[in-house]
Every structure is written in C-alpha cells, then in structure tokens.
Amino acid sequence: CTMLNVLTGTQEGLR
C-alpha cells in the first residue's frame, strides 16, 4: 500500500 492508498481507504488500497 502507498500513502495515496491509505488516504483513499483500505478497499482501494488493496487494489
């Protein structure tokens, strides 16, 4: 996961 993923959320972070 990246910083952007964390900001967007876990669901999107998994992608």
From Swiss-Prot:
The keyword Cell wall biogenesis/degradation does not apply. It catalyses: 2 a phenolic donor + H2O2 = 2 a phenolic radical donor + 2 H2O. It comes from the Eukaryota. Its EC number is 1.11.1.7. Binds 2 calcium ions per subunit. Binds 1 heme b (iron(II)-protoporphyrin IX) group per subunit. GO terms for biological process: hydrogen peroxide catabolic process. It is an enzyme of class 1 (oxidoreductase). Its cofactor is Ca(2+); heme b. GO terms for molecular function: lactoperoxidase activity; metal ion binding. Keywords: Calcium, Heme, Hydrogen peroxide, Iron, Metal-binding, Oxidoreductase, Peroxidase. Removal of H(2)O(2), oxidation of toxic reductants, biosynthesis and degradation of lignin, suberization, auxin catabolism, response to environmental stresses such as wounding, pathogen attack and oxidative stress. These functions might be dependent on each isozyme/isoform in each plant tissue. Belongs to the peroxidase family. Classical plant (class III) peroxidase subfamily. This is Peroxidase 3.
